[in-house]
Regions:
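Juxtamembrane/disordered regions of integral membrane proteins
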Residues: 1-145
Length: 145
């Protein structure tokens, strides 16, 4: 499978913006990055890699053929893909991480769910704008799937 420059630009821009919003939310608003007990450069490096993977999966969900029937707007398609990935990530995080933490209440879970949806929706919108505004000389269909 070959990818176009539209893919790479949208993928990287989405990952960078989601990573920046992650750092803003957890580093400045919640200030819970200060509780990390191991190497911060290692943590941020791994987080960067994770956001590259999340952005790739988000792009692939955005490109799902089933969306062709229901969404003609690139941005609405990005919002929908971001919502789906946000809910899935919240479920994974809730099962693997939050469930082992003490003092987690419903308000915290709701806020975390809404944040995951918002963060991934930001990434989906960036991908949608990339698909909308980045010009490709060759059609992406020429690259195959």
């Amino acid at each position: 499978m070959q990818y176009s420059s539209r893919f790479y630009i949208s993928w990287l821009a989405s990952a960078i913006l989601m990573y920046a919003s992650f750092v803003g939310w957890h580093g400045f608003f919640l200030n819970d990055l200060s509780y990390i007990t191991f190497s911060k450069p290692l943590f941020f490096g791994l987080a960067g890699f994770v956001y590259l993977v999340i952005s790739y999966v988000l792009y692939r969900v955005y490109e799902a053929k089933i969306f062709d029937r229901y969404f003609y707007s690139a941005v609405l398609r990005g919002v929908t893909a971001g919502f789906i990935i946000g809910v899935i990530l919240f479920a994974i995080i809730a099962v693997l991480g939050i469930s082992f933490t003490k003092h987690v209440n419903t308000t915290y879970l709701l806020a975390d769910c809404l944040w995951q949806i918002a963060e991934q929706t930001i990434g989906g919108v960036v991908i949608g704008f990339g698909k909308l505004f980045l010009f490709e000389v060759r059609s992406e269909a020429d690259y195959g799937d």
